[in-house]
């Protein structure tokens, strides 16, 4: 259908606009899968959390399952073996059971070499993927505020 915006597709998925809700949800799931495949590449070189933000985060309940599926995906070899695309456990922060599993991992501490300082350490490679609920402006403000506080501590 021509001229539909992501918001229109969301409205269809929610049953608030005429159209095929199942097709709209599937479109968002596929979007999530493609986004997740791109995130796999980034997360293999960056150690951090994955947060989906922007206008599409409002449709996160339809997008996130595809993202999580892609992040938990595997690749196969010609010999029939498979291995995970990410060398870490993936948790969906928006799913209560997954969130509890992630929190239950617990954190230890490790001593920084040549220092008396200890820092938090998770001895198991793990990542949570979640949705931004603040919007870009508020998230940037929080980041700037945290940065300013760190600068004051120097």
What are these regions (language model features)?
Residues 1-154:
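ATP-binding/phosphotransfer module of carbohydrate and carboxylate kinases, centering on a glycine-rich
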